[in-house]
């Protein structure tokens, strides 16, 4: 007892606690509830080895008598100290527990012999002590006999349990938090993480550690926490410290915003491609039609200066005024329409001014890349096309229109020339187009392109057919009808001696058609031709001897020839 008082005095324990320890054999249990309360927060990860450890403590509570055995083993305290030093890294907690460990170490000696450590529900009370009890767990893993034979090893775990409890919530809390994060699949350890977080809420690192350590040390801590209860946990307390810095290093990696670096290049290329396409579209339109380039230097030296200035403007991307590009688009319709038309017609005269401007601007654009040359070169061609292009258009139209008029007049004249021919007249008569034939006949007679005899024959044909109402009929049909009617009328004239009114007209029409269109003379029978010739002689008042048929008719009809001729 004096030895313990001396140790307590050295360690700074008050005598009241010592008396309490002496009075109650469950001093080991007194500290255990504290450990339980402290440990309940860390992580209730019930390792399967915990039940055997509790029975000894519960038995210790009921049996405080084994206190007299305390003085027997004074040497173990240094062993406990070494174990404690290995288990935890804080000296203050060692001093607190070093006073108690001898008592604990002594107490479990008889306690374990008497009750044969049945399941120790110490972990049930301090279910979270799995972190700290990880070391004793290997001893209880053998059945109860293991604890009986190793009485010294059994007491050490309680000491180990006590010493790490104050400090480990920092060290062990981290690993315990880490493995449950490694094992979100089971979801049983989530509550333990919350308990540890409640204790370590003031520590800023664990929240980051909860996020990051999940990927980093799964292999190290998941396997030991489940494979073996104790020694691995002690060693795990150290690896977490090793794993913590990587977590800190890992955290800053996502934190630095890389997106701004990606965003910076993206805006820069956008302005450059936007202006380029309009330039490409604008520049080629003026350049191809305007080939003459010798004139530009004298006419527009300013464009050459613009080319030199434009190179300076290239280095100044800021002067790219977007409001200016909209202004050039309206002229392009003016550029496009006139530029295509005038170079074909008036490139020699009127385009030299505008072409020189455009050619110089195109050369300047080609030399300088055309960043701002658009704005420099476009203003020069804009006024020029307005001045020249309308004139060019009007001139071109004036030139085009007279050509069309000439062609029309030529066509008209050719139609007149072709139409005013005897062949056309004959064709019109053949098809029965008497009106057109009349017009052609008048033109031919006025121009003197036809003989008077043909004019008379054509007139007789046209007038006779119109009078007989045989218009718009082919001449072949007309002849057949005329010959038939003439024969009938002529027979009647011979029988009666009375000449029909239309007989001579029919004879004249048939005679005119055959004379005007000799190809149709074969369609007229020869007797009809003879009869027609007789009638024509009688009509002309020829002598009696000239027309023998008349005498025959007179003798046949017994009428005087004079009467026949008169009729």
From Swiss-Prot:
Residues 7-393 are annotated as: Disordered. Keywords: Virion. Residues 180-200, 343-353 have a biased composition (Basic and acidic residues). Residues 219-231, 300-312, 354-372 have a biased composition (Low complexity). One of its GO terms (cellular component) is virion component. Residues 65-79, 253-278, 285-299, 319-335 have a biased composition (Pro residues). It is found in: Virion. The keyword Transmembrane does not apply. This is Structural protein ORF567. It comes from Acidianus two-tailed virus.
